[in-house]
Amino acid sequence: MAQTMLLTSGVTAGHFLRNKSPLAQPKVHHLFLSGNSPVALPSRRQSFVPLALFKPKTKAAPKKVEKPKSKVEDGIFGTSGGIGFTKANELFVGRVAMIGFAASLLGEALTGKGILAQLNLETGIPIYEAEPLLLFFILFTLLGAIGALGDRGKFVDDPPTGLEKAVIPPGKNVRSALGLKEQGPLFGFTKANELFVGRLAQLGIAFSLIGEIITGKGALAQLNIETGIPIQDIEPLVLLNVAFFFFAAINPGNGKFITDDGEES
């Protein structure tokens, strides 16, 4: 009898466990497990990645603005690219010519002799022995005066001052008190103007030398021959001309020189 009851209870318990749904089985097993058991059921974790609906627009890289190179200005015979004679070189030659022409006029006013005669007085070399050098000097001066040696680059004037600099505050210095600019050149004499005056001085030296070779007289004496005016009557004009050439030679004009390679000086 006791054995029959045990068998019946075992069959009933087994039948009950077989009819249970599989979802409930982990819970039954969990009831039989102790709380200190290290066995744990795996849990699912869902991770969410945030997505931006509006993304910032990527900025395009700024375009490089290439500065236009200064155009090479060829000389009359297209020699500017060959020997590299720039306007800065021509400006230097023009300054030397202005000093030389002013000194020759001053020397002729004092001694009454032209450039070649003054050179003979200083060196003692006869003119006929220096004829090749003299002809080369005349040719070089003429070619430089007409820009035949080349004129690479260009002169750029300084930018004009703004309206706020037009009114000069009082009490700065003497130039401000006279209504003149505090900084920069006193007069508006640019490097382009200085280049033009230098070319005129080169032409003056060249033609005065040619005239002295032909007539044997200096520049002032040639002027007397052409106009018939005595030198004594035009002394103030001669002195003014000499002073102007000296001042133009030593006065640094405003502006800057830009070559065809973009270099500034």
Swiss-Prot record:
GO biological process: nonphotochemical quenching; photosynthesis; thylakoid membrane organization
Subcellular location: Plastid, Chloroplast thylakoid membrane
Outcome of gene disruption: Normal green leaves under continuous-light conditions. Non-photochemical quenching (NPQ) phenotype. Accumulation of purple-colored anthocyanins leading to dark leaves after a prolonged exposure to fluctuating light. The double mutant missing DLDG1 and PsbS/NPQ4 (dldg1 npq4) has a pale-green phenotype similar to the dldlg1 simple mutant in continuous light, and an identically reduced NPQ induction as in the npq4 single mutant.
Transit peptide residues according to the UniProt entry: 1-59
UniProt main location, coarse: plastid
Record bears the keyword Transit peptide: yes
Residues in Sequence repeats: 54-158, 159-264
Cellular component terms per the entry's GO annotation: chloroplast; chloroplast thylakoid; chloroplast thylakoid membrane; nucleus; photosystem II; PSII associated light-harvesting complex II; thylakoid
PANTHER family in alphabetical order: UPF0041 BRAIN PROTEIN 44-RELATED
Full protein name: Photosystem II 22 kDa protein, chloroplastic
Species name: Arabidopsis thaliana
Record gene name: PSBS
